[in-house]
Amino acid sequence: MSANQNPSVQEVLGEVLGPWSDNERLKRESHFLRGTIEQDLQDRITGGFTADNFQLIRFHGMYQQDDRDIRAERSKQKLEPLHNVMLRARMPGGIITPHQWLAIDKFATEHTLYGSIRLTTRQTFQFHGVLKPNIKLMHQTLNSIGIDSIATAGDVNRNVLCTSNPVESELHLQAYEWAKKISEHLLPKTRAYAEIWLDGEKIEGPDEEPILGSNYLPRKFKTTVVIPPHNDVDVHANDLNFVAIGENGQLVGFNVLVGGGLAMTHGDTSTYPRRADDFGFIPLEKTLEVAAAVVSTQRDWGNRSNRKNAKTKYTLDRVGVEVFKAEVEKRAGITFAPSRAYEFTSRGDRIGWVEGIDGKHHLTLFIENGRILDFPGKPLKTGVAEIAKVHQGDFRMTANQNLIVAGVPADQKPHIEQLAREHGLIDDGVSEQRINSMACVAFPTCPLAMAEAERFLPSFVTEVEGILAKHALPKEENIILRVTGCPNGCGRAMLAEIGLVGKAPGRYNLHLGGNRNGTRIPKMYKENITDTQILQEIDELVGRWASERLDGEGFGDFTIRAGIIEEVIISKRDFYA
């Protein structure tokens, strides 16, 4: 039954899933995502959005948040929480010009509570702490420099990721162009964004959403374009992945992987992280048809009764991978060919300079946790702005929360490097362990956080560095370490060799068994333990790894081979077993 027939009870392929959730009512009654957002903007009594609009602003790229550090104190003073919004920009492939950067730097400085720019695992930037009177200004500022935030949140296709530094080869450039095409093709067609935020003309006549449908998707949907052997975008964290296949340096098509995703719910074993399934190879000319077919199949078959089981990964496990694949073939008018050979060998960013095929140079800057701010002794935000004032190329935000200064002519290299060093953007002493560690935002702004992540990680990494040194591991050795403040998985801990998932303040679930190239899900090793206990466990395990490992064996592979943790092969069967 089509998702757009709005039945009171959802039935898919003869299976009754149950009554539609209230989120489906909300979307159906929203007048194509307009709701009463405009009226809420005029309400100065509260700093927040009310009722359905609290959810609807997500489709416009925003989440309502507050400062949890001061929530209790404001409550004592009989004040409402300090409501504000976080905005996530739509930047397919993560490319931003120096002109655009200077504009977002200025807005962050003048109109946000925290003054920072946050690079994210979705290869874009976020503003945190934008108060209601500044929201419309924010959208209009972004629009004036060619940026929007349409569909970076909500039940739609989110920001499309692409392997970083697409000018490094002709293949990269072609793949980036496809990331942009896919993003545009799957974008909502409603005029609500322009009408509300950009004072666009209200055009009479019905809106139509030919791909997403009038109720949009059952849940968020994430898409990537990845260029092997580099898996920087973590394909298995995403619903739909196009793995670039090249011949003689030219892109000829994609292997299509469907059904990845990392979010879960503590205590609910019907939720689990899952690897994507390989559907097969398609030629380039079928890319947009296949993208639309996967999205529309999930639109019609995804669970609209239970949002915890609404993502594509659960649809595949419910109806069967082959059944889903056959429906995609039918809708796209193709037959998947056998997948072409490829291999992932790495996923971290190459910090420092690399030279492109065009003779220009690219400098990847390590930005710890993606937070660009002027820290004591490390004025990172000022430094990037100073580079933007003289840089002739562009910037590339990476899915590892770092920043690439791309397209630097040889004669500009010394000046760019000097600016980077003067502002703490280059640190020759940063360890491989720190470079390969990552956290989501969590406290104080994320309302879903159960434990610290971004503020916790730097000191925790220092402790892990000490453990590696204690066991005489070489300096270039590292463990893929990720921390996420809740089980929703923004920090992609469920593809790490060591993954920490927040359970309560100061407590985490410890997961082991992922691998370095991001193709294995880690399994829970210890539940609800403190950071001190986690470090004790890591110390013991690293000691064994240092003395027992095979030549070149990564930590995650060692934990599987040594029987410390069982391998997750089929998530539905193995993750909780």
Swiss-Prot record:
Coiled coil: none annotated. SUPFAM superfamilies: Nitrite and sulphite reductase 4Fe-4S domain-like (SSF56014), Nitrite/Sulfite reductase N-terminal domain-like (SSF55124). Keywords: 4Fe-4S, Amino-acid biosynthesis, Cysteine biosynthesis, Heme, Iron, Iron-sulfur, Metal-binding, NADP, Oxidoreductase. [4Fe-4S] cluster binds at C440, C446, C486, C490. Siroheme binds at C490. Its EC number is 1.8.1.2. The keyword Heme applies. Pathway: Sulfur metabolism; hydrogen sulfide biosynthesis; hydrogen sulfide from sulfite (NADPH route): step 1/1. It holds the Pfam family NIR_SIR_ferr. It catalyses: hydrogen sulfide + 3 NADP(+) + 3 H2O = sulfite + 3 NADPH + 4 H(+). One of its GO terms (biological process) is cysteine biosynthetic process. GO terms for cellular component: sulfite reductase complex (NADPH). It comes from the Bacteria. Its cofactor is siroheme; [4Fe-4S] cluster. One of its GO terms (molecular function) is heme binding. Belongs to the nitrite and sulfite reductase 4Fe-4S domain family. Component of the sulfite reductase complex that catalyzes the 6-electron reduction of sulfite to sulfide. This is one of several activities required for the biosynthesis of L-cysteine from sulfate. Alpha(8)-beta(8). The alpha component is a flavoprotein, the beta component is a hemoprotein. PANTHER family: SULFITE REDUCTASE [NADPH] SUBUNIT BETA, SULFITE REDUCTASE [NADPH] SUBUNIT BETA-RELATED. This is Sulfite reductase [NADPH] hemoprotein beta-component.
